[in-house]
């Protein structure tokens, strides 16, 4: 039959190799570093969108329960303890933060302009904007500015 190569051997093609000592790593490997950093940045933004989306959904659920079933401080505190006992590595579910999730949802849920923007901005930035600004115009301006900063960080590879 012919010579066969084990799948675990000779994974790289047989070529005349460049002496690694003669390489300029900064020049040769920089494109690979760019690929890695861009992927990391995209992953971070995707995780952030999902996290903010989760906070939105939790806020919507809590808001509905407060209105329909008169959930109050005690029930929200019980939920906070319950979820942290089941997911001990998950942060961000203190009673105070759960109320912020409700406020976050109620602040933006009626706005077609603002609700898509909040997912492009980190949770801390959303809380600052929501807590310090009254008008929708000001919120929109700073949400857009914060979203551009996130994109700029991504372009820089940070």
Predicted feature locations:
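Basic, low-complexity intrinsically disordered segments
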Residues: 1-158
């Amino acid at each position: 039959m012919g010579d066969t190569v084990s799948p675990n051997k000779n994974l790289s093609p047989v070529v005349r190799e460049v002496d690694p000592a003669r390489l300029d790593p900064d020049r040769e490997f920089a494109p690979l570093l760019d690929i890695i950093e861009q992927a990391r940045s995209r992953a971070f933004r995707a995780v952030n969108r999902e996290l903010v989306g989760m906070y939105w959904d939790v806020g919507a659920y809590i808001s509905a329960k407060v209105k329909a079933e008169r959930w109050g401080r005690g029930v929200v505190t019980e939920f906070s303890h319950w979820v942290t006992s089941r997911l001990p590595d998950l942060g961000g579910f203190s009673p105070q933060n759960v109320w912020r999730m409700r406020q976050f949802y109620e602040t933006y849920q009626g706005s077609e302009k603002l609700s898509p923007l909040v997912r492009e901005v980190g949770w801390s930035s959303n809380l600052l904007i929501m807590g310090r600004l009254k008008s929708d115009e000001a919120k929109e301006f700073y949400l857009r500015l914060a979203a551009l900063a996130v994109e700029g960080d991504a372009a820089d590879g940070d």
